[in-house]
Design a protein with these regions (language model features):
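DNA-contacting interfaces and partner/effector-binding or oligomerization modules
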Residues: 2-35
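General helical structural elements
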Residues: 6, 38, 167-168
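Short secondary-structure junctions
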Residues: 12, 52-55, 173
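Nucleic acid-binding interface residues in structured DNA/RNA-binding domains
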Residues: 16-19, 27, 76-186
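Beta-strand scaffold of nucleotide-dependent catalytic cores
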Residues: 22, 42-44, 149
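Structural motif
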Residues: 30, 39-40, 139
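Compact structured core domains
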Residues: 34-79
Length: 186
């Protein structure tokens, strides 16, 4: 049987690239940046087969520059304006997570205790985070190891490798299980 070239719909990869206003290369793959109506809408961790994409607007360009600065220097502080998204509970979780210092990790249980909630609910709020890096959910781990990341089942291990890279980049001690957690929120 012979096949000939024909016009075909966009592949899922091409469709995925099209939704982003910019794509920044990263040591673990790429980071997709989506803007809409003058607001940042999403930062997404993308596998290595995504190609870089120049910013399509000024806000995407600003986000690209800040992501690149963070990737070069873990001490960089983001100044991107984030739209108010999520429930009041999710915002409480994200606020607590934003206070975790670089190079440190906290468990889902520690965050839950701090805000008066349950660890599973904290994990669900982490998975609903549209702005990872800026709201650093990678700094929240399970009591006995990395736990999940970005609400993905992660059979490929990609998202956990991103979490591991981010924590290493920020200087978090990854050796040893269970994790040695620092006291916080007395």
């Amino acid at each position: 049987m012979r096949y000939t070239a024909a016009m075909t719909p966009l592949t899922p990869l091409q469709q995925g690239s099209a939704i982003f206003s910019a794509i920044v290369a990263a040591p673990f793959g790429a980071i997709g940046i989506r803007t809409e109506a003058g607001q940042l809408r999403e930062l997404a961790y993308l596998p290595p087969h995504f190609s870089e994409k120049d910013a399509t607007d000024a806000l995407a360009g600003q986000a690209c520059r800040q992501v690149e600065r963070y990737l070069a220097d873990a001490d960089f502080t983001f100044s991107l304006a984030l739209p108010e998204v999520g429930s009041a509970f999710q915002q409480r979780v994200w606020g607590a997570i934003a206070s975790i210092p670089r190079g440190s990790v906290r468990t889902y249980g520690q965050v839950a205790k701090h805000i008066g909630s349950a660890p599973r609910a904290v994990g669900q709020a982490c998975g609903a985070n549209w702005f990872p890096l800026v709201i650093p959910c990678h700094r929240v781990t399970a009591a006995g190891g990395l736990g999940g990341f970005s609400n993905h089942d992660d059979e490929s291990g990609f998202h956990l490798s991103v979490k591991r890279w981010l924590l290493t980049h920020e200087g978090a001690a990854l050796a040893g299980t269970p994790w040695q957690q620092q006291a916080m929120w007395a």
